[in-house]
Design a protein with these regions (language model features):
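Peripheral, non-AAA+ core regions of ATP-driven protein-machinery
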Residues: 1-25, 29-214
Length: 214
């Protein structure tokens, strides 16, 4: 069954508080995944100044152990959503690991995860916009049920295969992720103001200004 991941932010020092780890429900591989996505976020939003927020990350209504890194991309997208205050689509599921550069990495159980979300969609009510984001490197592992294959073929369900977490952000938040100009020095680099990273950058810059004023 799908899990719901949420992230909230408060004034802090750029840390990601892994609630599962704090209450001893998270395994070491999951904790490593959280540290890796923290490093990625610092590299895109904290090159020249500390991110002045602490993020609290959790699996909602999960009361058993959590391990593995297959939720890393989902957690990263949840954090970016919280920082930028841009809502995430709730009709798309995502699974996949990521490295410090944001590159998508394969995970296990991809068929079961897709089938689980598809079945939940059937129970809650199917719409043609629903689907699952997976790492492109898992495409060779797909052996899905016929009803799912048929739904995908008819455009009634979607499987998006991605190579980078920014592609997931764009699908989930409905905006371009943004990139820094290649010619810009790190201290002068600005993301497009309409992009996901640009919106997040503006909010962090405003918060840093308040901190300096105080």
């Amino acid at each position: 069954m799908p899990n719901r991941i949420t992230a909230t932010t408060a004034f802090g020092k750029g840390e990601v508080m892994d609630i599962e780890h704090r209450v001893k429900l998270g395994g070491r591989i999951h904790s490593k995944g959280v540290l890796i996505l923290t490093a990625y976020l610092a590299s895109v939003l904290g090159k020249t100044a500390q991110i002045p927020l602490t993020t609290y990350l959790t699996f909602e209504q999960s009361y058993s152990g959590v391990d593995g890194d297959s939720a890393s991309m989902a957690e990263c997208c949840a954090i970016i959503s919280a920082i930028s205050e841009q809502a995430i689509r709730q009709d798309i599921a995502i699974t996949g690991s990521m490295n410090q550069f944001g590159e998508a990495q394969p995970i296990g159980g991809v068929n079961e995860k897709i089938e689980g979300f598809f079945d939940v969609c059937k129970i809650k009510g199917r719409t043609p916009e629903q689907g699952v984001i997976i790492p492109a490197s898992n495409m060779a592992n797909l052996m899905l049920r016929k009803d799912i294959v048929d739904a995908v073929a008819q455009g009634e369900f979607h499987i998006w295969a991605i190579t980078h977490v920014t592609q997931a952000m764009e699908l989930l938040l409905g905006k371009t992720a943004g990139s820094l100009p290649q010619t810009a020095a790190p201290s002068q680099g600005q993301y497009s103001p309409e992009s996901i990273f640009g919106i997040a950058q503006q909010k962090l810059t405003a918060l840093r200004s308040l901190v300096k004023t105080d």
